[in-house]
């Protein structure tokens, strides 16, 4: 399954329709306009009421209003709501991410495990790597990796099926999402590669300097259990691969043969690409879901100057190649790669090397360029393994995506995965075929297939 399928994105626009209002004592009223905000769990109200005094609001004198915070198709395992805390003339906006309210959706997409992982990121991993950088003298956002949303509260109780992550609304600081339907351009790609290099460098340095402190973040691939078990997930993978093959031209004999060969051992390949031990001693903590809906940009005179990464629900300890291939093959097209593929890798490695120097290490020891090139050959096919899921979704308008809760309910009743979420529609078939064909061709061209 595409990693996006296990994530919730901060939306391009809010579906502002209704609000549910509560005061500091929990008294509620609902205002109906068109589509009503559902009844939200008590633990979310409690978390916000706990946060409000810390943010300077007076106990009993503030109100909390809720609005929708994400759009259809933004993610399987989480729902986003916008909370506005008000007192007098003061209004503060927060984004609240919680597991799906629908029981079937929460169960079928393993929401609680994903939230536990993301809470670990905001509660422990990010504070730890920020502290580590500062201890090494890397203090400025311009010099290191500090580019994540401010998190005010992160909690997960898997037994109680409760979790909430309260973050800043980046739009209030003029951050914007890249339109997922557009191919990323050079400036945005270079900015992402720069910060990805910094993120990976921190892993390489910290596991050398503080191995015991770093150890809790060596999380395995979250998809391994589904890959090992017979069932709808495996059937869906085969269906996606067949869709790629069907998009190839009849004369694409080499491409067809390579994909048919991949189909024979695709489950083993997906697991192999996620095995950290095969990448050691060069494995890193990867973001795991590096596509444009999980990053936002701030601009100056139309030029992207700052990037923020979010949605860490599938973070894992793995080869650095995974994040690279995920972004390059899902967010760019054949034309971009012909022009800039090698330059993107160069930008990434230069940034990683510079960051390691700041952390008082040497890239030639911790990740030599020759080793990176070798790992690209070993793990590079991850580009098509993720592209076969994400490319059709990136070519599909949100209003054409199927209903996630209906999908989950059907899975509960039939134990079969409705494959329609990853299918193309009549309106996007041509765009999908062009993009996925170039992914296959480029994976072959670079020696990854």
Please identify what each model-predicted range represents.
Residues 10, 23-25, 171-287, 296-302, ...:
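ATP-dependent phospho-/nucleotidyl transfer catalytic cores
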Residues 11-12, 24-69:
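Juxta-kinase regulatory segment immediately upstream of eukaryotic protein kinase catalytic domains
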Residues 120, 124, 314-359, 383-406, ...:
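Active-site activation/catalytic loop segments of kinase-like enzymes and analogous catalytic loops
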